[in-house]
């Protein structure tokens, strides 16, 4: 029998969050399954959707001063939160941080803007270079943080500079060469910075050709990815010299399930919520996949999904 989740709410912290962001922005014991694309996860003690960069800065300062754990989310597309929830502050930089501005060959966007929306804005402006991101179901902030990529393109190819909030409360603009982009990695991720916005550099292109390329990639996704189920996208990073999905398939794990978490039969690189999955199901499924692939092929698969909380 599952134990009841222990929720730790301190009224003085709630009051201080109210003062900073307003009562409408603060929720307590908020189920994180409502804020992740895998649709799993227990309650966050405090869930805050700030309205301004200054509110973010003040909330981070409060958390640092009071030694409260904090974590920033966008639309939760690459995140699995523990069934026990998160004993700290979740900062939702999503709905209140959307905005896209095209200036010549450059696009300036806020962190909560969806990559799909930015790609569409680029197409409408006749700008090419972002077609690869037209189906990535995440925000600009998350995409920059992890150097998201697909179909041969990565965010590092187009990012010119990024506005961040450091953990000590300083708002800085980092140029491309300062971002330390690697495969699903960046300085932003390593140092725990908060992405506030970014400037992207694209190139002029033919609108019809851009649209055709985006449609081609969409058709590939529909054909090969389990878009009809909740998931966290690609489950594993690509091991050098291999494809993660093929290793999982060759290990005989297509359709393999733990509870409601299942290896997609459509694409073995994806784990899906086939119904009623828990975060523990997802974690156990990943562990079993890792063990099986390691045993059969000597390759250690590393999760691309980020896990938050206690497992």
Language-model segment annotations:
Residues 66, 73-75, 158, 229-230, ...:
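Short, basic and Ser/Thr-rich N-terminal targeting/leader segments
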Residues 27-28, 79, 165-292, 296-311:
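Phosphate/pyrophosphate- and phosphate-bearing ligand-binding catalytic cores of soluble enzymes
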Residues 122, 140, 144-148, 163-166, ...:
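Short, well-ordered alpha-helical segments in soluble proteins
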Residues 9-140:
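Anion-binding (especially nucleotide phosphate/pyrophosphate-binding) glycine-rich loop
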Residues 41-42, 47-53, 80-98, 145-176, ...:
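Structural signature of FAD isoalloxazine-binding scaffolds in flavoprotein oxidoreductases
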Residues 1-7:
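N-terminal amphipathic/basic-hydrophobic helices that include classical n-h-c signal peptides
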Residues 8, 12, 33, 51-54, ...:
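Conserved active-site and cofactor/substrate-binding residues in soluble primary-metabolism enzymes
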Residues 78-79, 119-122, 130-134, 147-154, ...:
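A generic local secondary-structure boundary/capping motif
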